[in-house]
Amino acid sequence: MCNGSIMDKLISFALPLMLSGVLQLMFNAVDIIVVGRFSGSQALAAVGSTTALIAVFTNLFIGISLGANVLGARFYAAGRHREMSETVHTAITLALISGIAMAFIGVLFARGALELMGTPDDVIRLSTLYMRIYFCGMPFFMLYNYGAAILRAVGDTKRPLIFLLISGSTNAVLNLVLVIKFDLGVAGVGIATVISQMISCVLVLRCLYKSDSSYQLRFSKLKIKKAYMIQIFQVGIPAGIQSTVINLSNVLLQSSVNSFGSTAMAGYTAANNLFGFLYVSVNSVTLACMSFTSQNYGVGKLKRMDRVLRDCIILSVSVSLALGVGVYVFGPEILQIYTTDPAVIQCAMEILLYTTVTYFFCGLMDLFPGALRGMGHSAVPMILSVIGTVGTRIVWIYGIFPQHRSLAILFISYPASWILTIVMQVICFYFVRRHVHRTHAELGANIENKQQ
């Protein structure tokens, strides 16, 4: 990450990440396709209506894994083996504790949270059932995500891809067996998901355990070291809060979609799944930007750090434009995989119009905070993202949408919030970058004076 062609290394790092995300979404799409095709539109709406809510519950803790990624990348690049080992064991312990806590919270509060979202009576029972089963697998989900974050920190994005391929294939097969053969509906989809999460968890922990490097995992060493936990939290908690609060705005948006009935809900579920393919593609570039920035920051290569961001911008815009236009152009054909209901497809296409061709704005919005987190600055980007993204959407949902009730007006809030947030993040990045370069120059001058 710290030497050689940046673009080549970015692509080789980001491509497995991108494929991992696409695979995960493809297997999630199998959930939706199978339940939509063989259990009906109510079951499809039930599974889809939980997506934003599950993200709210989980993203705080997944965000904290970014702290482990940044800290691990910095220590690994600098050759600080003891600190790297302590980071690994602290992160895995945090993953286990947070996973167990999330399982209890999700099971206990699923029904109440869905009621607060205004989930229609005809789907809430199925939504609650799916959500409770899903949360039973949360310890496995958290352990996999934290383990994969550690592997990304050392530049390994290929093995997580292999693990997802194995677990996701299992998930797809189990979906077909449990839903079609045993007619378990949303329960079958939930059970298949939990089993696949358990498999991916076992594979990533085994990988860390078998390692002979500084990121080797030893279960006897699992404990939280306060100093490392604080450093992980300094980067991870703001990232997690940002993701959680943004998803809260998506919950509000889901509630607004719910007001149009189960047809619009099913359309949003299908569109949101396609929307996810765009997200994982640009997010892989953001994660690459964060990891590359962190390693170069750790060894003091600030000019290379600037070139990393430049190349990431080129890569992110190119990927998101190509995929966004492609998804919209071929949207009607792709959506028929999810459902054959013309009304559902029409709703989905109306949503995709405003969220696909403009998605490169979202990629740019995330890149600058990614670079800032790589330098250890996470709080201010979080605040700006919350103000720009969530603030805009809340004003839109409660101010503009009630006056012009349509799916089109509702989803214009996405590009509007992205553009406003980009402006604020660019200004923030300019000042932080200037401070980092100045501090580094002063430190170099002080060292030179002492040597003289």
Predicted regions and their residues:
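Helix-terminus/linker motif at the lipid-water interface of multi-pass membrane proteins
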Residues: 26-45, 114-121, 177-184, 244-277, ...
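Transmembrane helical elements of multi-pass membrane transporters/channels
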Residues: 12-31, 133, 144, 167, ...
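Short alpha-helical transmembrane segments in multi-pass integral membrane proteins
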Residues: 1-14, 72-137, 181-237, 293-358, ...
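Small-residue-rich hydrophobic transmembrane alpha-helices
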Residues: 44-104, 141-160, 267-325, 329-331, ...
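Short runs within selected transmembrane alpha-helices of multi-pass transporters and secretion channels
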Residues: 65, 134-152, 160-171, 189-204, ...
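Hydrophobic transmembrane alpha-helices of multi-pass small-molecule transporters
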Residues: 56-59, 171-175, 201-205, 277-280, ...
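Transmembrane alpha-helix boundary and packing residues in multipass membrane permease domains
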Residues: 17, 21, 33, 70, ...
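Residue-level signal for short hydrophobic patches within transmembrane helices
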Residues: 3, 7-26, 30, 53-60, ...
